[in-house]
């Protein structure tokens, strides 16, 4: 167990598997919880006693060992250690995972830490982790190189084989062609021979035939032919002709012709045969060449294919690189190409493997640093992000592989309990269901792996295990959320931490406590300011242990047990003892919502009958309580220290002033005001008017005798001074022996009675006393009695006897509070008495309707009819008609209100209530007696139909309907506003919670100028704004130069009066905005604590006060403005609460104003229906040259020249002189004896003004503006203002803008509260160039830390970092705080914790929230004093033991261990605190009053 005071800081980091195992008391292997029959935990299950400890104190599981005497024994039978059952809240178990799983925070966070570290996109990382893709985790370069060579050789061989095949085919083709051609040659020859032979045969036949015919003819020569003689178709001799020699000649001719024809035919046939053969040869050759080409192409394409294939496969081989993501197909292909060259895997195991093998943080950091310095744009941005993660791991000592879990811790069973319900069923924490899923899947996976199941089944089981662990850590972060029975989403470990119901906000920052109760409140008019009425029954229950102890002490009971019985039976003696006990005790009363510190105050309890708590009427304002059914809670501070603190700091009579404004918060109101107003009224003509009395006593005697009315004006002689103006004549007669004036005063008996109730220094006030007057009396009383100058030493001695020996300032404050409280009580009693005596009440007849009302309405209706007529005639637009009518009715309502006011009887009860500000105002009265007027519709637009009736007359149905809009809107707005205001308060608290006054003076020379000219803008007096500040520079009389006050002097009331008299318009004051304290704020910069009227004390939690002061009135702010027109105009800017949020979140405002970007002159331009505003900045540079006597200009006046042009040269040829040359381009100006070149540099910035935008006041053509000045109306964007005008301008702007909103709603808040918040918004700087620091570009650093680090670097001769001021909204600022506990308990818990764990963040517990979370005394108020005392004690011890040294050295020798322990204590105390007195430390009621709050679970449940 942690000893609560033994540490000064808390560190969060990643847990290694060894850490998890070292925490664990055993492995949970079964998903079972408890046995349904025995209802005892199952062995090795989620509630196993052997692992987590026994369920009953000092008793083992099997019952072998019972009682405390066996403490520490481990049962040999069931293995359970005999110890207390509360160890089940502390002891953890573990689950050994069959396969590593990733921690979802580091995978799915933005940015993904795992992804950044490995340079893998979140999408790819997710695909690997959830078994959708492979990742290469190892590459064997040697095998890869061998495989490359083998591939190249294989393809080389393939190429050669194909080429060889192609060559052999070529040879084949050539041989075939040769053969074919040879065959054709021989065929041709045989054809020729055949033709030759054929024709030879034919010739022989013809010749033979001719020979035969010749022979015949020769034989028959001279004879006549018997028939036609024919030769080859030609008739030689016709029948009957004689055969002659000619006939033979003709035959010879015919024979020759025939043979010649035959020869020709032969030649032709031979030619044909030859041609045929040639064609065939050509065909064959062509076919062969085509075949060869085809073969070549095939070869080439095959070779190309091989080259491509080889290239692809080599590329695939080269693509085998670490971290490459592969899908199933790619993985298979690569495995074929390069078996053994790489190893790819899926899931968290693969990622872990990759981290262990490849991530060398030092080397990676070096590479990334180089990249950051050498690249630009997106690459630099990414490198910076990665470097941030790498540096976080390096500095924190975390190992990246710890982001992957191999062992899963199981939280103690009592933190995830299982309880039996009435019906015998069990209710269990969702965590048990989630753990059960993990265990089931893990066991199934182990079994599958043992069985060597197919890869796909194992893979699926691993994915399911990963999803189960994800659901356990953060259900719903990825994919669909796991839901239990009844479809509700199971609450995971992350859900246990985050949100309003999470561990931080529900159990650590606010706990339900014992010794508390609540009841309805009723008014207690007879109580003193510091008292409350506590019902007896309630008190008895609250103080039960104290009563029991006193009963035993008095002997009324023998022991605690019998005392308890007596109390429970409520015997009569119990009440006396209770009276005795309660006498010394204070109780705390609290009314929710606790919007500021005055919502919890301490009171002395006064026992009363009944069941309601009685509350003093004057503290109602602080609690914002009324008696219409409000409830309040009562708490009892237990320890002496708590009682003392409640008495000195929380008692209601010491909380008279509001911490937000410094005004009294216990101002009398309502009946009291009415009573005092009635008492101090003058009624002319009342009984006894005008009588004269020699003294006050004489006048009172006359009143007692009934001779004078209480309100009758009378004349009284009296001695003394008047306070303030008198509303009746005063005549100074003379002075008494002490110099006090004697006067004759016109006053009333009522005023005499009233003044008699005032303390001596506050008399005599001779005027009508309303609410404001009573507030002044309370304020004056407090100021008078807390001013040490007004107290004598005798007074101080009296005070010392009451409060002990304390600082004089404290004594004055306590005494002033005491006197003011008693004065307030006297006024309260008087007010109630005369409110009763006066009998003021309200009846229907008191509401009198003014006769002028009908006239006003008739006149308004007449004017409206005229406007309508003009509209119908087309003289005015719809918009103008609407505006006119609204204005007419608003004026009518105003006139009616005036008439009501005039017609009112000033002595009537209604008028008295309104005029005294006791209740109600004239507008409400006007609605009752005048007219209700105009109403808004649901959109906020004013309905032009007025409600002419009032409540006295009653509304018509239509009027009632119209008025419901406004009513409903009011209610809806209020509901929305309350939630918004609450959230704003929470953000403000978070951003400012570590702002505590830590030192006296930070020593800064900087401050803040407060100008009288700002008064109009922020609606507050200059004097009011400087009051309570400390001067940052001496204040000087502007006329004489006399120093009125030195630097660091407080501006008190006297000095503000002096400033007003001398007309001083600006004062340079210390401000939280300029404070340079390393942690918190210094007293000088903060100035006066408004709640005490004195300089703030060290330890005051000014941040919390500021946040409460701004947040508490938030509900009063209207939600949004209603504009009168239908169309939004540029002045329809956000107001009220949304505007406050806009300011504090540093958002771009709605209706943003255009600002001048540079100093210059305005030009208004209109181009193509577009309005442009141009700002032109002109800079003139002049280059003058003196002209020597013999020089003449060579350029004309007004000429344009360039740099290097000749301007003048010598007119004497005998002199060898240089010409005068222009040193810059520009226009020439020639003067007497000199020549100048004037260069004009123009810079132009142009913006387009929207049509709706209206120009800001004073913006016209030729107007001179400065950078950051408004060109159009609207709110400036604070980020733009910061860039243009710098830090101071934006600070002033934010403070003034916030004040405008609050003041316009009549809410007073002191500037310094807003300044505290604005300071937090501007605390950070963004690193631009890191120089020699170890910062990273873009990192957000605390400005004081930045300055300190740079100073160190400069002192070592290094190059400092550069940075720009950042303006962060309060939400962002809260999340960038140095304390991870504060940030995690605010918002985005998982993101904050993820970041903090990786960086190994250390929380030095400097703020309030972090100390509350871990249950330590807060470093504020009395906590800070306790710290200092203890630190001084330890320093004293150290001074006696060791020489002082700043270095903390690791001591190895045993004799130094004691010194080191002392050092540790000192460190713990200086940076932390002590827990104060706990119940029982004083030995008062240690046995009888165990504190039964849930405090002992805080360590385990973080």
Swiss-Prot record:
GO CC field: DNA-directed RNA polymerase complex
Cofactor note text: Binds 1 Mg(2+) ion per subunit. Binds 2 Zn(2+) ions per subunit.
Binding residues annotated for Zn(2+) 1, in chain numbering: 60, 62, 75, 78
Ligand binding (Zn(2+) 2): 1002, 1075, 1082, 1085
Region (Disordered): 265-293, 1472-1502
Keyword Kinase: no
Top-level taxon: Bacteria
Keywords for this protein: DNA-directed RNA polymerase, Magnesium, Metal-binding, Nucleotidyltransferase, Transcription, Transferase, Zinc
Biased composition (Basic and acidic residues): 279-293
Pfam families on file: RNA_pol_Rpb1_1 (PF04997), RNA_pol_Rpb1_2 (PF00623), RNA_pol_Rpb1_3 (PF04983), RNA_pol_Rpb1_4 (PF05000), RNA_pol_Rpb1_5 (PF04998)
Family from the record: Belongs to the RNA polymerase beta' chain family.
Description of how the protein assembles with itself and partners: The RNAP catalytic core consists of 2 alpha, 1 beta, 1 beta' and 1 omega subunit. When a sigma factor is associated with the core the holoenzyme is formed, which can initiate transcription.
PANTHER family: DNA-DIRECTED RNA POLYMERASE, DNA-DIRECTED RNA POLYMERASE SUBUNIT BETA
Protein name: DNA-directed RNA polymerase subunit beta'
The species this protein was found in: Roseiflexus castenholzii (strain DSM 13941 / HLO8)
Lineage, top ranks: Bacteria, Bacillati, Chloroflexota, Chloroflexia, Chloroflexales
Name of the encoding gene: rpoC
